[in-house]
């Protein structure tokens, strides 16, 4: 069994240390108040037994809490007082220097929590370590100076999660939709250099990758671009290539316009291939100031095209994008594997969902790609037009910002809908499970605590908003001055765009499944559980609507994709409430409104049920189904896609995509338990070295490739198939 030290390092549990610590406290009291050596040894044994039953690595603080409880149970109150006083004094010493140990442990790669915090960051790399070092300083400043104590306390107890405190010290926003069209058509400035409108498709792709990198370095959340904004440059290249071909072949006999066009189209396809390849490889190899590849989503929506020519050219780009993602990228052994980025989103619409539709061939290619590489994910134009309705009563279809955060419909001062160039200010998530358990099955008490926690979240969200208020455009010129989001003057504040619905700010929620079960012993898949779950969702929306009306700030409800935080919430719940069957008996809690990963339910029933909850998450949410290897059953994949089109706005299919670099095995790398810890192992050769295997799993909308903490790993291990 292992424990996690305060600096994040993971070490073997040693019961002798408990005996030594209690003995020191025991020796400092009068003889009549002392415990016997047998009592002290029994305490160490009981703590070890309780820790083993937790099925995860406990922190030093949790072990010490158990020791305190056991001493009190022995009624050795004087010993307990000395033990608690010693802990308190040590805590004061540690508090005087809050970051040194954390920073040193991550530099020396001893910090297990940091190693497993982000499934797309490699914590052994210098650039990532620099980002983590800055993050530790930011978290320290945020905790001691920038946030009210009540918010810090609630965050530390796992009552709420104040997202991205490692960036909160700076005036940075979360995620956005990049206005690539404006930047390419009207020019932009990158690092003080004027970039004019490109004169070819390949140049447009190159500029796009530079924009992606610059944007990623100026924010902490994801970004999305649309292939539609690149489509006009296909015809620019077409006309340019035609002129060149005509000049080359003009002296040859029998050269017709038809032959010129045929040669030109062949060269055009080669340029499209190079351009898309450039985006794929640049995105996975670029390193931003965040110490990672840009978290970027590429949107593929035929309905965005302005005319038939642009639509046909967009189809060419989409086709090439899907082909290249299906192929994958080579790992260091030269083997084709699944890349994490860019995330791809494909819109299902009338012109591509039916077998006799014009672009059905693209949908079949998308299904083939999903079965092998887990992308693209799917948006239903049909359902989104029903869910995203603006103040004029018009429905809209558009992409999320990065993983799943959706803007709310917005009409500008000219009466036109606007999505590209807008952003999200940040997220605070409520732990619904904690409210449910705190109520102790009393519904009146539940709603009282719910109201109190909502106001706590509101104050935390106001802190996020206030941190951005007064931010000048100079903080991130690529965003605020040169078109990625806006074109403000130098020194101009962004305040106007924090109000009026231009940007959103998100109230996140997690653990609806466990919350409902803790209250009424019913699952979301049962009628009573579903009804209560939907009631809670409607109540959450009532609060965001109330805040929005009062402050003219676009508060929106968001289905939080917990990554490392799922483990933190689970540990906090176990500490506060103990182990409760079907609620706190795992090292993770369920994301947003999702059906529990262990629930036996088929794909269609799951999507149909979750669609009701997704419609009540206007700030973003995504549903998924877990499937086996479907590469030889694409018709089944297509049937799920057709169901998505008719029933749910945004969904994805999860499969596995692994490779062992030791033996070449390309089946599923499995999760084993070893000495209380979950580890990854090749079932063919027994390789357990994570640096010598490629494992890709859906983590929270994105694909993760750098492994996960113990809570998320347990969740991945316990996922059941839905198809």
Tell where the protein language model's regions lie, with residue ranges:
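Conserved catalytic cores of very large enzyme subunits
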Residues: 89-93, 99-501, 522, 526-688, ...
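Conformational switch/transducer regions in large eukaryotic molecular machines and scaffolds
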Residues: 14, 677, 699-702
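Amphipathic, well-packed alpha-helical segments that form the structural scaffold of globular domains
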Residues: 23, 458, 462, 513-517
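Metallocofactor- and cofactor-centric catalytic cores in central/energy metabolism, strongly enriched
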Residues: 272-276, 280, 518, 712-718
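Charged, amphipathic alpha-helical regulatory modules used
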Residues: 1-110, 717-722
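Long insertion/accessory domains within large nucleic-acid-processing enzymes
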Residues: 684-723
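Contiguous, well-ordered alpha-helical segments that form the cores/surfaces of helical PPI scaffolds
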Residues: 232, 300, 505-518, 538, ...
């Amino acid at each position: 069994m292992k424990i996690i030290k305060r600096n994040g390092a993971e070490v073997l549990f040693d019961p002798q240390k408990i005996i030594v610590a209690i003995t020191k406290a025991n020796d400092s009291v009068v003889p009549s108040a002392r415990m016997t050596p047998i009592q002290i040894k029994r305490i160490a044994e009981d703590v070890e037994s309780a820790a083993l039953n937790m099925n995860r690595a406990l922190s030093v603080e949790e072990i010490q809490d158990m020791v305190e409880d056991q001493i009190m149970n022995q009624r050795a109150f004087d010993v307990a007082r000395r033990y608690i006083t010693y802990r308190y004094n040590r805590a004061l010493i540690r508090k005087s220097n809050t970051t040194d140990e954390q920073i040193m442990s991550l530099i020396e790669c001893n910090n297990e929590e940091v190693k497993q915090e982000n499934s797309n960051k490699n914590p052994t790399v210098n650039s990532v370590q620099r980002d983590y070092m800055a993050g530790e300083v930011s978290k320290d400043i945020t905790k001691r100076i920038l946030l009210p104590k009540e918010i810090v306390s609630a965050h530390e107890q796992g009552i709420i999660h104040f997202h991205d405190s490692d960036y909160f010290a700076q005036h940075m926003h979360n995620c956005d939709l990049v206005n690539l069209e404006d930047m390419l058509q009207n020019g932009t400035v990158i690092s003080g250099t004027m970039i004019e409108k490109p004169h070819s498709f390949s140049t447009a792709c190159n500029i796009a990758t530079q924009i992606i990198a610059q944007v990623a370095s100026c924010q902490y959340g994801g970004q999305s671009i649309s292939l539609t904004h690149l489509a006009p440059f296909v015809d620019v290249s077409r006309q340019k290539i035609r002129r060149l071909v005509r000049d080359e072949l003009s002296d040859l006999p029998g050269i017709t316009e038809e032959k010129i066009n045929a040669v030109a189209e062949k060269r055009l396809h080669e340029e499209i291939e190079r351009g898309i390849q450039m985006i794929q490889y640049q995105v996975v190899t670029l390193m931003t100031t965040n110490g990672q590849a840009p978290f970027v989503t590429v949107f593929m929506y035929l309905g965005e095209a302005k005319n038939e020519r642009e639509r046909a050219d967009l189809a060419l780009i989409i086709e090439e994008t899907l082909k290249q993602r299906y192929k994958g990228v080579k790992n260091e052994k030269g083997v084709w594997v699944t890349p994490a980025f860019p995330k791809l989103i494909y819109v299902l619409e009338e012109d591509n969902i039916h077998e006799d539709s014009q672009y059905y061939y693209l949908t079949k290619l998308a299904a083939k790609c999903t079965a092998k590489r887990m992308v693209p994910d799917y948006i239903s134009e049909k359902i989104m037009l029903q869910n995203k309705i603006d103040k004029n009563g018009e429905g809209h279809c558009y992409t999320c910002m990065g993983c799943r955060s959706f803007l709310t419909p917005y009409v500008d001062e000219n009466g036109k809908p606007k999505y590209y160039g807008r952003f999200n200010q940040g997220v605070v998530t409520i732990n619904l499970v904690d409210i449910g358990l705190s109520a102790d099955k009393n519904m009146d008490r539940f709603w009282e605590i719910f109201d109190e926690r909502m106001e706590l979240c509101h104050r935390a969200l106001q802190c996020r908003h206030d941190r951005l208020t007064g931010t000048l455009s100079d903080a991130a010129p690529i965003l605020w001055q040169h078109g990625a989001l806006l074109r403000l003057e130098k020194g101009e504040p962004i305040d106007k765009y924090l109000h009026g619905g231009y940007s959103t700010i998100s109230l996140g929620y997690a653990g609806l499944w466990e919350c409902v079960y803790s209250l009424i012993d019913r699952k979301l898949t049962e009628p009573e559980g579903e009804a209560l779950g939907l009631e809670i969702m409607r109540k959450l929306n009532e609060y965001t609507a109330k805040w929005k009306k009062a402050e003219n700030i676009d508060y929106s409800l968001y289905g939080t994709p917990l990554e490392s935080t799922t483990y933190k919430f689970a540990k906090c719940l176990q500490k506060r409430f103990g182990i409760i069957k079907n609620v706190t008996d795992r090292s993770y809690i369920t994301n947003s409104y999702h059906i529990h990963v262990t629930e036996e339910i088929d794909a269609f029933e799951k999507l149909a049920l979750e669609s009701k909850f997704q419609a009540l998450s206007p700030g973003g949410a995504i549903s998924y189904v877990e499937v086996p290897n479907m590469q030889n059953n694409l018709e089944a994949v297509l049937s799920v896609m057709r169901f998505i089109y008719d029933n749910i706005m945004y969904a994805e299919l999860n499969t596995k995509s692994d490779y062992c670099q030791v033996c070449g095995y390309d089946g599923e790398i499995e999760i084993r338990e070893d000495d209380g810890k979950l580890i990854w192992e090749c079932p063919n050769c027994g390789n357990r070295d994570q640096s010598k295997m490629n494992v890709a799993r859906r983590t929270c909308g994105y694909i993760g490739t750098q492994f996960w903490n113990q809570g998320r790993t347990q969740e991945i291990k316990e996922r059941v198939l839905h198809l």
